[in-house]
Regions:
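Hydrophobic pocket/interface hotspot
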Residues: 28, 102
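Sec-dependent N-terminal signal peptides
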Residues: 1-2
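C-terminal motif of bacterial Sec signal peptides marking the signal peptidase cleavage site
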Residues: 5-8
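Electron-transfer interface patches adjacent to heme c in soluble/periplasmic c-type cytochromes
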Residues: 56-77, 88-101, 109
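Periplasmic/extracellular electron-transfer cofactor-ligation site
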Residues: 11-16, 21-23, 29-64, 81-88, ...
Length: 112
C-alpha cells in the first residue's frame, strides 16, 4: 500500500502524497481528518476510529475506508443522510463544496 509509507507533513497532518493532489482532494483530506476520523478508519490520514477491537470497529465506528471503496455519489448520500441504513453518523457533518471535497478525497483514497 503506497499510502502506508506516506509521511505526515505540515500542521494539517496531510501526507506528502495527498499534498501533491488537486486542491479539492487536499481539502477533503483535511476535512475528513478533522470531522470524520473520530469514527472512521483510513490509514492515509492516520484515522483509526474509536475502538481498537477490529471485530467491533465497523459496527461501532462506521466503515473502515482502508478496505471499503466508495463512489463520490455514495459518500454524498451517506453525508446527507447520516450514513447508510441503521447508521449513527451525524447528518450533514459537512455540506456544499466541503461535502464534495470529502467525496472526492474518499473516492480516490478509500479501499486502496
Amino acid at each position: 500500500m503506497a499510502a502506508a509509507g506516506a509521511v505526515a507533513c505540515g500542521s494539517q497532518g496531510i501526507s506528502s502524497e495527498i499534498a501533491s493532489q488537486p486542491e479539492n482532494v487536499q481539502h477533503g483530506a483535511q476535512l475528513f481528518s478533522e470531522r470524520c476520523s473520530g469514527c472512521h478508519t483510513l490509514e492515509v490520514v492516520g484515522a483509526q476510529g474509536t475502538t481498537l477491537n477490529v471485530r467491533e470497529r465497523e459496527r461501532v465506528d462506521g466503515p473502515n475506508f482502508n478496505t471499503r471503496h466508495e463512489t463520490p455519489d455514495n459518500v454524498l448520500y451517506a453525508i446527507r443522510n447520516g450514513g447508510f441504513s441503521g447508521a449513527i453518523m451525524p447528518q450533514n457533518i459537512v455540506v456544499g463544496k466541503d461535502a464534495d471535497d470529502v467525496a472526492a478525497f474518499l473516492s480516490k483514497y478509500a479501499g486502496r
